[in-house]
Amino acid sequence: MAQHVTLERAECSAQLAPWVENYWSLRWDLPPDTSYLSSTLPHPACNLSVERGIRRDGVDDDPVVVTGVVTRRFDVTIRGAGWVYAAKFRPGGLAALTGAHARDLRDVTVAATTVFDPATTDALRDLAGTDGGRETFDDALARLATTPTDDYLLLLEVIAAMLADRSLLRVAEVEQRCGVGTRTLQRLFERYVGVTPKWVLSRYRMHDVVTDLDAGYGGSLADLAAKYGWFDQAHFTREFTDLIGVPPGSYQRRER
């Protein structure tokens, strides 16, 4: 199936880098009567995408859509031929760039016109394929770029610490590391990210679990869970299964 589906990533312009993590594209041309399940683990990021060949509920067939932070595994089944070109925002980046409230977008896909101005969405709607995606997105989003606020820069600092230091297992440890109070941290995540700091930290550590298993970890799953902050094995198994689709033991055996 790999020869029929192509996933690529590209950098955005330096002007947009404070808000946009990267661009990504998916192209497919599947044989008749076949389908491909595209699965994505939850990340604390919103996406702005132009989609051709995919039908989304609730967007009135508008190809330019915004998908908020998804709190469970995100599955899309593709058939026939089509493509997607998208901007993946940094955690909090969409809200910081547009003024949208991230919590309102959590676990939903909406027409981009509900978040962006008509000039931006019209420019993206004219995109005819993935080849010109980078330039089109750069040009469309550049008009929104301003100077990042101090609050947003503080949020990015916190997110960077969560990502870089695998030993951070509790929100209190993050607060101490970054010198941020509990109320301030909760307010930043509520406003910009749309989910709690605890949820984001837990997702990052679960991504670390998957990374270790993909690298061939052969030790005890209880030890691996405890390493990343889960001391209740049943809780760890439920969270892993909800996100990955199979229990951690089955995933570990499959990766060996």
Where are these regions (language model features)?
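General helical structural elements
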Residues: V76, R187, R191, H207-V209, ...
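Alpha-helical bundle regulatory/interaction domains
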Residues: M1-T182, Y192-P197, T211-G216, S220-F231, ...
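DNA major-groove recognition helix of helix-turn-helix
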Residues: F189, L201, F240-T241, Q252
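Extracellularly exposed regions in secreted/surface proteins, prominently low-complexity, repeat-rich
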Residues: H235-E239, V246
